Amino acid sequence: MLFALPFPAIDPVLVEIGPFAIRWYALAYIVGLLGGWWYTRFLSRRSRPPVMSDADVDDLLVWATLGTILGGRLGYVVFYNAAHFLANPLEIPMLWHGGMSFHGGLVGVITATVLFCRSRRLSVARVGDLVALVAPLGLFFGRLANFINGELFGRPAPDVPWAMVFPHGGPLPRHPSQLYEATLEGLVLFCLLGLLWRFTALSRKPGQIIGLFLIGYGLSRITAEFFREPDAQIGFLALGVTMGQILSLPMILAGIVVFVVARRAKPLAVPGGR
């Protein structure tokens, strides 16, 4: 080991009052959801015609939150630690012990969004486009929280100047892969989709943004996984791939299908509108 940046000594607990503690991870969820709520309102109002009312956006936040938490937890249980939870089923609802899966959360949010739109008679494609536009914002804050917690760290990288020794990652300096993911899945995808929505006619054919999000996230995750240490209970799979990469491949394929189908549809009959 020639050089390693010191890992910032940040307490995972932001505020502790008696038996109650607010962790950075919880704060990341709150900031991501509230930021997404505000941005969804902004995008809906700018659309012509508006995608939904402000009251609908408020209700969608509740549906999306439940979908994220339930789907994320069940996804982790099924994809990443099924044997453990089969032996200890009472631990499944113990979210404070950690263990959430993005891919499970995605399925949960999609399910919640479809059910919500059907209950309000809203366009699934138009609402879905807005959800896809705001999702990278939540991913950005979530990955920053992973970094603060010192979890989901990268693979050993003793020759990388910005490598860090993580508290639970052994003596070797490692890639700060959480920051890579925050950049790719968060900032880059957020800016790219936002620019496409603002300066192209993609929103005239609802569903195209959804497809691009699925493709963009899948490619970003597969790339970041080359630097991220796989989960200890799973390790590397066949040919050295990781579970995250395997789960991201169907996302890319689904994104291509969604984009092509949406692109072939008739555009919204709103001259110059979004």
From Swiss-Prot:
Q: What is its main location?
A: membrane
* EC nos: 2.5.1.145
> What is this protein for, i.e. what is its function?
Catalyzes the transfer of the diacylglyceryl group from phosphatidylglycerol to the sulfhydryl group of the N-terminal cysteine of a prolipoprotein, the first step in the formation of mature lipoproteins.
> Which ranges does the record mark as transmembrane?
24-44, 60-80, 96-116, 122-142, 182-202, 207-227, 241-261
Family per similarity comment: Belongs to the Lgt family.
Q: Which domain of life is it from?
A: Bacteria
According to its UniProt entry, this protein's organism is Rhodospirillum rubrum (strain ATCC 11170 / ATH 1.1.1 / DSM 467 / LMG 4362 / NCIMB 8255 / S1)
Q: Does the keyword Transmembrane helix apply?
A: yes
**May I have one GO cellular component term?**
plasma membrane
Name the keywords, alphabetized: Cell inner membrane, Cell membrane, Membrane, Transferase, Transmembrane, Transmembrane helix
Q: In which pathway does it act?
A: Protein modification; lipoprotein biosynthesis (diacylglyceryl transfer)
Q: What protein is this chain from?
A: Phosphatidylglycerol--prolipoprotein diacylglyceryl transferase
